């Protein structure tokens, strides 16, 4: 029987943060958080030699590039099988059960843990120059993005903005399904602004793309490719070398 050991990740990462953030050049963090994407649904084998740990249908060349140039943490378990508890756990570095946020909408102990430090707050505590941003799906009823320490945000969004315009009635245009491209452009613009201002940054880009209802560009319906990640890499020459990209799934 396999036992999964949960850890309070932010506590463990504090010494690491202190060491790298006190360096001459603070690194930039880009966390791409993917909703409803399964562990074996990209073309990257999560376990070498195991065909059942990757997809031979979905072609994700830029995720392959991330894996090739970085690390694949195949035993890095998501905090929960549900999106909202996972997002809250990632933000605070605590398990859903400890936060008492284990289902989609019920926040049982909100007042008891709002004082817990978050990733943006931890970065700012280590280096006050950090600028933090969150774009895309928030879906965390325990706390608003600004209260969590984000300087720039497009609001405490749920799943709706992934399908509808701001009026919540008009479907998104065909050229921007699930806001894939506009979210990516917004993220690239944010990064450019911080580079120009010589400010270190932390960006969390939480895509709606994999969540139902599924949508795509007309010309790519027959063949999926991770165009949004590719768009980010096409802009890499405009960004500093001190960048740590992280791709995570909130369910797998």
Positions of PLM-derived features:
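Bacterial N-terminal signal peptides that target proteins for export
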Residues: 1-11
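Formylglycine-dependent sulfatase
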Residues: 7, 22-252
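Bacterial N-terminal signal peptides
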Residues: 9-19
């Amino acid at each position: 029987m396999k036992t999964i050991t949960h850890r309070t990740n932010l506590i463990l990462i504090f010494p690491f943060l202190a060491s790298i953030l006190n360096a001459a050049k603070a690194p930039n963090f880009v966390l791409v958080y993917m909703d409803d994407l399964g562990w074996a649904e990209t073309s990257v084998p999560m376990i070498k030699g195991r065909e059942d740990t990757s997809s031979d249908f979905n072609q994700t060349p830029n995720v392959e590039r991330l894996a090739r140039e970085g690390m694949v943490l195949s035993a890095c378990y998501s905090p929960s099988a549900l999106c909202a508890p996972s997002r809250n756990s990632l933000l605070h570095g605590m398990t859903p059960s400890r936060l008492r946020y284990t289902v989609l909408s019920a926040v049982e102990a909100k007042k008891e843990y709002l004082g817990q430090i978050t990733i943006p707050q931890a970065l700012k505590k280590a280096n006050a120059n950090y600028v933090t941003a969150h774009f895309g799906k928030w879906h965390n009823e325990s706390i608003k993005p600004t209260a969590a320490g984000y300087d720039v945000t497009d609001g405490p969004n749920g799943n709706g903005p992934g399908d509808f315009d701001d009026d919540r009635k008009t479907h998104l245009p065909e050229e921007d399904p699930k806001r894939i491209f506009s979210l990516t452009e917004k993220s690239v613009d944010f990064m450019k602004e911080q580079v120009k201002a010589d400010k270190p940054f932390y960006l969390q880009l939480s895509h709606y793309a994999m969540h139902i209802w599924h949508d795509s560009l007309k010309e790519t319906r027959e063949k999926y490719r991770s165009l949004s990640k590719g768009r980010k890499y096409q802009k890499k020459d405009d960004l500093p070398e001190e960048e740590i990209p992280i791709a995570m799934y909130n369910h797998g």
